[in-house]
């Protein structure tokens, strides 16, 4: 549900984060977008410069921000939707800024078990968040892409709409078929395949709604590693 600064190889919570990466044109109600499997409702911007990042996103989206430890919590329309935290000095696993996204699952324990069976590594064991926001864990998927798995609690998070709301997420992968099956098994979503200019493009679906896209990394982009964007 939330993560924060990384210390001694672990993500330490500093603020409840909830980024609703959902397709707003779906017409699904906000509460559904916050709880349906495959919905993106938690994210932490891990950055080299916390203050610069906060200034940039505050100006870009007019988000409301509040200090949370050494970082910030981010609110949109009164709901907590994200957090910003700094990269720990000397952390070999994090060398540059990135958004760590979170995906809703119905059964966190079951999803972790499925992830491990499919080649994932558990980075942060399940951690309950106070305030009724639920429980989260952090894994690296079969291609080493970091992602949060979130089992929501009673307190609603994310699910906002309009300017400043999040509307989509996309997984860049070296193997679109393998990645699609991994998240189908782990998250409990379906996936549909399309042809986009002669290139395969898959979409995660749940409850009749498109949740995110999957694209295979072009051969010419040799330095791009699998990950969520």
Please give the residue ranges for each predicted region:
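Core segments of cupin and vicinal oxygen chelate
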Residues: 35-37, 41-81, 117, 123-134, ...
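N-terminal secretory signal peptides that target proteins for export/translocation
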Residues: 1-9
